[in-house]
């Protein structure tokens, strides 16, 4: 009999539903038991965040900075600038639209009530270093490896990255549904889960519309550069979009993205280089989601969300997206460090960010891979071999 496999998104959705359902009748002692698990898991996650940054950013900087040519540098720069643009577009739209949706939502006191479910005990696992130190260390080490070309250090960094990715895949992601279950169990027990969910649904609808607008803008730029119809170019990329909706993986969608990019007239040399590279470093859709979710949660809790703070957050987030691992939920795991260090998100805010992000993981990935086709068109305009 064929084994039924549930992906991360279905498990997260089931965890949310069960958390709300069981929270209506489970006794406080059981809720405290899950609060104990959440406390330990959260401390473990906070311990891992600097290691995730070092493990992912260091080899990424070493590879991008190794001087493989102008094509690599320009592709990486365009991918980064597009990611930053997506974050700024998301912030401005969220600031204009979300206040109308979040009015009457959960207040600061309501959000804080979930923290009143105290664990039986907790285990302190302090991080080895803070997030900013880890980020600066990663840049210094990565650039140093690129400059000196040390194969031994690169091999060590690559193996450490494998350890980090394996930890995310085997320890963090499998336990996330239980963690999310505990969060919504506590929120239901304290009576404010429904108001949070109501806001969640409204936010998801707006973010979906935003990512469609972002794709249109990306292909309008590509169309202007190549002097071609942007909507026809975007239409050609739709098979890649719908494939990514099903796989939630940029890497798994590469064959389809590459095929549709070639159908758009991009040369085989440029497409073969840019599509696999952008599948790793171009996460405009993921950035759009993370910024919007962060703005929404900060509005819900009356936290300041001024433009200066968010600009710094978006610039750092763009770097973290370059280094994000290619696993479901990898982008939000890579972003936890800057969410905490720049925006001041605590354990509960980070848990809600994870839940909200993963419920939209598939169309964020679809936005990422479809946008790769737009970047390939621009790169091809200037780097196609003339015959």
Language model features by range: what are they?
Residues 35-46, 155-170, 235-243, 259-263, ...:
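Short amphipathic alpha-helical coupling elements at transmembrane boundaries
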Residues 111, 234-291, 318-332, 359-378:
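Alpha-helical membrane segments and immediately flanking helix-loop junctions
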Residues 2-26, 39-48, 70-232:
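Signature of multi-pass transmembrane helix bundles
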Residues 69-75, 170-173, 263-279, 305-308, ...:
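Membrane-interface alpha-helices at helix entry/exit sites of multi-pass transporters
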Residues 19, 50-58, 86, 90, ...:
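Alpha-helical transmembrane segments of polytopic integral membrane proteins
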Residues 40, 44, 57-58, 75-80, ...:
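Transmembrane helix-bundle signature of multi-pass membrane transporters/permeases
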Residues 102, 291-387:
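Transmembrane alpha-helical segments and their short flanking loops
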Residues 33, 69, 73, 193-201, ...:
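Membrane-water interface of transmembrane alpha-helices in multipass transporters/channels
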């Amino acid at each position: 009999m064929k084994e039924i496999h549930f992906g991360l998104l279905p498990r997260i959705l089931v965890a949310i539903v069960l958390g709300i359902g069981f929270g209506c009748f489970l006794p406080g002692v059981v809720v405290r038991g899950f609060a104990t698990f959440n406390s330990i898991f959260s401390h473990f996650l906070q311990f891992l965040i600097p290691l995730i940054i070092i493990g992912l950013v260091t080899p990424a900087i070493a590879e991008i900075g190794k001087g493989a040519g102008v094509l690599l540098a320009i592709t990486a720069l365009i991918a980064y600038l597009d990611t930053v643009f997506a974050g700024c577009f998301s912030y401005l739209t969220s600031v204009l639209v979300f206040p109308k949706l979040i009015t009457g939502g959960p207040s600061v006191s309501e959000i804080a009530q979930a923290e009143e479910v105290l664990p039986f005990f907790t285990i302190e696992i302090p991080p080895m270093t803070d997030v900013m130190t880890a980020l600066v260390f990663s840049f210094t080490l990565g650039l140093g490896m690129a400059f000196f070309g040390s194969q031994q250090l690169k091999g060590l960094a690559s193996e450490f990255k494998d350890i980090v990715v394996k930890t995310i895949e085997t320890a963090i992601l499998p336990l996330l549904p239980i963690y999310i279950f505990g969060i919504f169990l506590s929120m239901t027990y304290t009576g404010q889960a429904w108001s949070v969910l109501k806001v969640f649904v409204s936010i998801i609808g707006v973010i979906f519309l935003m990512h469609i607008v972002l794709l249109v803008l990306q292909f309008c730029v590509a169309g202007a550069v190549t002097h071609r119809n942007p909507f026809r170019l975007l239409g050609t990329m739709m098979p890649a979009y719908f494939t990514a909706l099903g796989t939630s993986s940029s890497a798994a969608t590469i064959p389809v993205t590459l095929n549709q990019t070639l159908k758009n007239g991009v040369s085989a040399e440029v497409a073969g280089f840019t599509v696999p590279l952008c599948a790793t470093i171009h996460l405009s859709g993921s950035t759009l989601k993370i910024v919007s979710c962060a703005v929404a949660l900060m509005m819900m809790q009356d936290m300041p969300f001024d433009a200066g703070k968010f600009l710094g957050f978006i610039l750092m987030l763009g770097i973290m997206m370059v280094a994000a691992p290619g696993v479901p939920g990898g982008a939000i795991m890579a972003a936890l460090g800057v969410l905490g260090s720049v925006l001041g998100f605590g354990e509960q805010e980070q848990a809600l960010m994870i839940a909200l992000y993963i419920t939209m993981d598939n169309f964020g990935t679809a936005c990422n891979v479809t946008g790769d086709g737009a970047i390939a068109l621009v790169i091809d305009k200037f780097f196609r071999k003339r015959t």
